[in-house]
């Protein structure tokens, strides 16, 4: 084995480490962040090793759009494509108000963010106090103070929900609470949690470990989850004072940000060592396999939407209420999907049995299954009998177990009737016809297949019996050579069968006849020398 100098090995190791830390996270502009190491979060719980071997790139997806309420009222048609959506005319920094403007305003107008409608309540509005959840008055056994998050910096911990929380149309049962004033909602856990897929009432460089009064606690009553950052301080500017705020996730998908103590303007918080954000974000993950390195996958995270709230409106005794808007994911049938008028270009994919605009967390499945090509047709097959079958089989999909049975059956029906669209209603119709005896050809085929199967088994059994009988007879004759059966087979052994044998050893063909038993006379054929 070739030997390498220790100095070369050390240099190669340093280069690999530098390459790992600088190239592992690639941003939209193609340049690694200057403070990329300072923005990394540690997760307090262990996760599968497959996630540790994954490189995560964070790209801001370019097809983000903003919906205008006045435009939707004037035009009552669905958008044909994402490209027709009007882009945001100005960046978020241009929308910020001047520092000297009065923040004690009444109810703000509803702002449509395409997936959510946000409403900001000022300090003088009673809704700001009504939306604040007083955790101290809740049941003590349900309020949990996270010990690790309350005493560490840049840490995150998983929290299980007792209910299904819809986020951008996807149902979540698990979230990740971070010390930096935000909740991570992604399934792929990495160290760049601040990049995307977050619910951020106030994302900043908070460090609960600098004060004994700082805590991170949460409360789950079965219909809502409240996460509160209580008396937390900024690590790089402790003298600014403590912040107290919370985020409430409701079962119906609403998200409420409540602010009790905000000592300074949020726009004045430094983002040098940690990003400062207020809003929502979601993304989809694309998995790439690296051919040069087996068993290693590279995950690229594309942000497809972001809600950026006006940080200048975040003050003491203020609140933000975000109400979810309908999405394509809520439709489970082709007809309602393609005919929906919700502001998205919803399409139905028969292979996945899913309705989507093409931009959600299932983006990779949508593309790999060829759904973009199928969605161009914008048609549903066999949609007329949908209403007649839905009433008779409405309760079939009531439970998850029964729905799985229908899904399995739907695949079988699809293979038998390739011309029909395998929607949920079509599956129910096919099951109904089969129960009434309409599918006689299928029954005949099943009977024929059963007969062939039984005949094959009988033939194998007969063959086994014949072989076993032959073995037993052979063993018996070997041990009883004078028995009648042995003498019978000896007299009729192959060597005494009349036959013509081919004589070898000469260049001429020659035949010899085997004489019958009892005949002594014969002749000899001589060959020429």
Curated annotation (Swiss-Prot):
Residues carrying sugar: 103, 160
TM ranges: 455-475
Keyword Phosphoprotein: yes
Region of interest (Disordered), residue spans: 80-104
Protein name according to UniProt: Plexin domain-containing protein 2
Membrane topology per record: Single-pass type I membrane protein
PTM-bearing positions, type Phosphoserine: 506
Keyword Glycoprotein: yes
Subunit structure: Interacts with CTTN.
Residue intervals on the Cytoplasmic side: 476-529
Gene this chain is encoded by: PLXDC2
Record topology, Extracellular segments: 31-454
PSI domain span: 327-372
Cell compartment(s), UniProt: Membrane
Protein species of origin: Homo sapiens (Human)
Family the entry assigns: Belongs to the plexin family.
SMART domains: PSI (SM00423)
Function: May play a role in tumor angiogenesis.
Tissues where this protein is expressed: Expressed in the endothelial cells of the stroma but not in the endothelial cells of normal colonic tissue.
GO cellular component: membrane
UniProt keyword list: Glycoprotein, Membrane, Phosphoprotein, Signal, Transmembrane, Transmembrane helix
Pfam family, one: PSI
Native organism taxonomy: Eukaryota, Metazoa, Chordata, Craniata, Vertebrata
InterPro entries documented for this protein: Plexin_repeat, PLXDC, PSI
Signal peptide start and end residues: 1-30
